[in-house]
């Protein structure tokens, strides 16, 4: 009797020896993984877990970090540099620390410290309220009193050379000086008033821009405004103004107030030796504003100093709607983001400052700390993903993260990598790392970093009250590292009957490490263990693994300790569409 001859199934081998990281999409390539934990691109193309993290220090209340010659951070009320604490009376809010030369500006406290001389620190703002009588008198620009002035509507008769006359024949009154050479009274274009009171000038510096209030004299109401201090002593200040006679305001008439203010800013950055900031909402004076500000050149204390010079402060209103969501300096230009646009400031002094507005994907609200620069490219969290901005238009860099929705992103950069921790819709934190040189994402763990800071050869993060080292320097922070990778659907793209008869994994393991292999078959949700391997010595393995016969499957590899996977080879036996 003759029987039909069985047709031998065609067998093929597919080897993956280049592993390209995380891709959380429905269809992914061989060598990519739908899910992972604690993996890294450091050993690319080899698949390997990351290094263990370390701990730098465990302060009582870390609130912010900045890199100077050494790592500086805020611990409660202290600013700490080189592990030397300076009690600055800081509040307990999260900080934004901005470097400007040797100085560090601490927001929202509006304080500063000189990192070259930590005994030099103070407040950006200053204020004086009089507690005794205040005297107003006409003076020169350096504060010297005028003497023997005539106040009248008619010219003085037979004046001496350089005689002074306040002409009251018209308003506003004018101060004139007699020139014997030309036999003419010449108007003095700019006149100054000395405001004298004990201690009035001690908190301020020459050329500070201040707000003055509380002056009751009708003739001096113009002084209740923003003024520039042209000269000062401990007990007087000199501002622009004119009055006919010496005037005194008694304590009973009320106190005068002199203030050097900094605007209430949503976000702040430094560019070209100026501090830049933005505000959307109610300002100090109660007005609703939508403005961008710049401090005086080289002087972070002055935000309302207008002298007609290239060093002046700067303020400009914006025409776009919505709150500001972040600020950073990129390629020498201050950038101010909203969710749907970016404002870019061009120019190098107030007269030629220009603000260009580009409608594009901006920074998502609540993700202002996601702004970080890697190799001249700015990365940030927009509403629909991570964007890369090179100065023209942003492009998406996070296709591999899939369709998951994330918020509250905090990011840092070190070397070629962009580290970002984000919260998903379930409230779970996830740390992702984007290797910009290799174009690959990797998922680490559920670390919730409050801030990052790259200093020298380490990336620091504040998490759970510790300052940890992401690259592993310092004391031990973690035990044996647990890691995992999970493939996408293997075999689902082919319509023919087939099954994976064998998996061969080439790998090496450190002493004490353990690796477990699991499979999920067809549409089952259960994971079945295939193989467990424990290493008692440092060696490499080639593991033959035989999964069940199925149409498609997923592979999950879990491990504890250091291991490296060099290749995964599939042996596939394949028939036709029917058999």
Give, region by region, the residue ranges found by the protein language model.
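Small/polar beta-strand repeat architecture
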Residues: 4-9, 122-126, 130, 171, ...
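Beta-propeller and closely related beta-pinwheel folds
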Residues: 52, 261-413, 440-443
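Beta-strand-rich solenoidal segments
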Residues: 85-138, 225-226
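Short hydrophobic/aromatic-rich beta-strand motifs
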Residues: 102-106, 156-177, 207-213, 227, ...
């Amino acid at each position: 009797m003759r029987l039909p001859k069985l047709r031998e199934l065609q067998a093929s081998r597919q080897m993956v020896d280049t592993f390209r990281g995380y891709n959380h999409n429905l269809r992914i390539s061989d060598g990519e993984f739908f899910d992972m934990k604690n993996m890294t691109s450091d050993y690319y193309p080899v698949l390997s877990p990351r290094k263990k993290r370390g701990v730098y220090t465990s302060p009582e209340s870390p609130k912010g970090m900045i890199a100077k010659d050494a790592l500086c951070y805020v611990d409660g009320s202290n600013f700490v540099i080189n592990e030397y604490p300076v009690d600055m009376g800081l509040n307990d809010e999260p900080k934004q620390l901005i470097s400007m030369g040797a100085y560090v500006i601490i927001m929202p406290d509006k304080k500063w410290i000189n990192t070259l001389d930590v005994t030099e620190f103070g407040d950006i703002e200053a204020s004086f309220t009089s507690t005794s009588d205040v005297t107003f008198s006409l003076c020169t620009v350096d504060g010297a009193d005028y003497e023997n002035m005539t106040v009248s509507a008619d010219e003085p008769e037979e004046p001496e050379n350089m005689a002074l006359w306040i002409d009251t024949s018209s308003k506003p009154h004018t101060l004139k000086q007699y020139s014997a050479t030309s036999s003419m009274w010449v108007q003095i274009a700019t006149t100054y008033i000395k405001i004298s009171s004990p201690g009035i000038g001690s908190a301020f510096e020459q050329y500070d821009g201040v707000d003055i209030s509380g002056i009751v004299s009708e003739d001096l109401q113009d002084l209740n405004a923003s003024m520039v201090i042209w000269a000062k002593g401990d007990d007087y200040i000199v501002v622009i103004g004119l009055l006919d006679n010496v005037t005194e305001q008694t304590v009973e008439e009320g106190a005068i107030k002199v203030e050097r203010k900094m605007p209430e800013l949503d976000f702040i950055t430094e560019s070209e030796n100026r501090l830049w900031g933005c505000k959307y909402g109610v300002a100090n004076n109660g007005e609703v504003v939508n403005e961008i500000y710049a401090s005086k050149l080289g002087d972070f204390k002055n935000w309302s100093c207008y002298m007609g010079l290239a060093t002046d402060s700067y303020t400009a209103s914006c025409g776009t709607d919505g709150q500001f969501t972040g600020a950073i300096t990129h390629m020498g230009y201050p950038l101010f983001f909203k969710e749907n646009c970016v404002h870019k400031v061009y120019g190098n002094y107030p007269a030629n400052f220009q603000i260009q507005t580009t409608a594009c994907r901006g920074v998502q609200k609540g993700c202002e700390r996601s702004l970080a620069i890697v190799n001249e490219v700015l990365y940030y969290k927009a509403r629909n993903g991570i964007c890369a901005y090179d100065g023209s238009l942003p492009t998406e860099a996070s296709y591999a993260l899939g369709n998951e929705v994330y918020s509250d992103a905090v990011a840092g950069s070190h070397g070629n990598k962009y580290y970002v921790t984000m919260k998903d819709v379930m409230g779970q934190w996830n740390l992702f790392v984007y290797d910009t040189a290799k174009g690959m994402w990797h998922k680490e763990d559920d670390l919730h970093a409050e801030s990052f800071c790259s200093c020298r050869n380490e990336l620091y993060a504040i998490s759970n009250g510790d300052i940890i080292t992401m690259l592993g320097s310092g004391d031990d922070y973690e035990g044996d590292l647990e890691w995992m990778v999970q493939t996408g659907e293997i075999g689902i793209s082919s319509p023919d009957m087939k099954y994976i008869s064998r998996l061969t994994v080439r790998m090496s393991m450190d002493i004490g490490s353990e690796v477990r292999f699991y499979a999920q078959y067809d549409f089952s949700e259960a994971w079945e263990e295939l193989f467990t391997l424990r290493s008692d010595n440092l060696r490499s393995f080639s593991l033959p693994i035989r999964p069940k016969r199925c149409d498609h499957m997923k592979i999950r590899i879990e491990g504890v300790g250091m291991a490296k996977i060099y290749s995964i080879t599939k042996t596939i036996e394949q028939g036709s569409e029917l058999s």
